[in-house]
Amino acid sequence: MPPQASVANPRFAFDGIRAQIRDLHTESIADLAIRARELGDVIPLWYGEGDMVTPPFIREAAKAALDEGQTFYIPNMHGYGPLNEALAGYQTRLHGRDIPVSRTTVTPGGMQALFMALELLVDTGTNVVYVAPQWPNIHNAIHLVGGEPRPFSLDFDGDWKLDLDGLFAACDARTRAIFLSTPSNPTGWTASREEMLALLEFSRRTGIWIISDEVYGRLYFDAPVAPSILQIAEDGDRVLSVNSFSKAWAMTGWRIGWLTHPSAVAGQIGAMTQLMNSGTSGSVQAGATAAILEGEPLVEEIRRRIRTGLDLAYGALAQIPGMVLPTKPRGGMYAFFAVEGEADARKVCADILEKARVGLAPGYLFGSKANAFLRMCVCRERGQIETALGRMLAMRN
């Protein structure tokens, strides 16, 4: 019998833990955040979250559901009926393709939708090729389900560009899926319709799945929605689309998203839902239903706020000597920029925090290609962005 774990002998507390869990780590801005609390008066632009409180029409719908006694399990593991119907209509209208109820499953957050997509496909010994720079949760989630995370970086020459031939060459016989975020967190890079068509054709030829993270799809500035794989894929294609209410409807704390999948795997997705989380809270789903049915003005307001923030950021940062500003992104909620001569932005972020009281996310979080970059969330009230940029200008000039 192995020795019992104890405070005096904690090593044995880790016996038997799965390697993927034992080795799991999260990259964060924790040290900067701790310092920010010590400094006070810090404008936090490092998180991927706006400052808008969820509007009353969504909150009231959730409250009404609670008041009506909606405190029980939702028996359909794919979601609350009115929300399923609303999502089917919404996606069909938005993408110009029939996307029926059978193709959508509601999840407690976009991260859960992503995790279910990976659990559906990834075995130990297989890999997922993902487009980088990328939100660090993606790398860790692939690792957590037992797969090999295989980053493939966008090229940067003043603009972020995807080398499709290189991406396809990075795949091999063990590749289960290609993962991309479009618009991207952190770069704002957005796949074109032509790139989506090439990805879909590659999937049809090879059997490799496409997982498209479209959480920022409505935060696109050239059209009501960014180019989507759902606009061209058939129900029988090996395509999964991850989405969330967090960004476009100001609902980050509600933890609700959805996965769009082929009808043929609906049974497996429903079973996974039952075993992993037993469904999403009914009152939260009621709020999300209101967001879908009544929320277009809200989406447009958030989009305008981001465009204003980006315009302000680019106008101010261009005045700071040595700033490297990529082509202004067409989507997302971030300005992603670098400082000439700085190979690692962590020192720059710490310096800006100390001297300007502005919190930015260092690029190393998003992969080695992004080490020199800083991420600024611009989905904030105009005055807050102006104050932050004013402090940075005063510091750097």
What are these regions (language model features)?
Residues 2-13, 18-109, 116, 292-294, ...:
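N-terminal small-domain helix-loop-helix segment of the aminotransferase-like
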Residues 2-4, 89, 168, 342-343, ...:
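PLP-dependent enzyme catalytic core of the Aspartate aminotransferase-like
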Residues 2-7, 232, 237-307, 314-316, ...:
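Conserved core segment of the aminotransferase class I/II
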Residues 39, 145, 205-206, 356:
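Helix C-cap/helix->beta junction micro-motif
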Residues 103, 120-142:
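Conserved PLP-anchoring active-site segment centered on the Schiff-base-forming lysine
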Residues 126, 147, 205-208, 237:
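A short helix->loop->beta-strand "cap" motif at the edges of active sites that frequently abuts
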Residues 150, 154-222:
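Active-site phosphate-binding strand-loop segment of PLP-dependent enzymes
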Residues 289, 305-314, 325-338:
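Conserved glycine-rich beta-strand-loop-beta hairpin in the small C-terminal domain of fold type I
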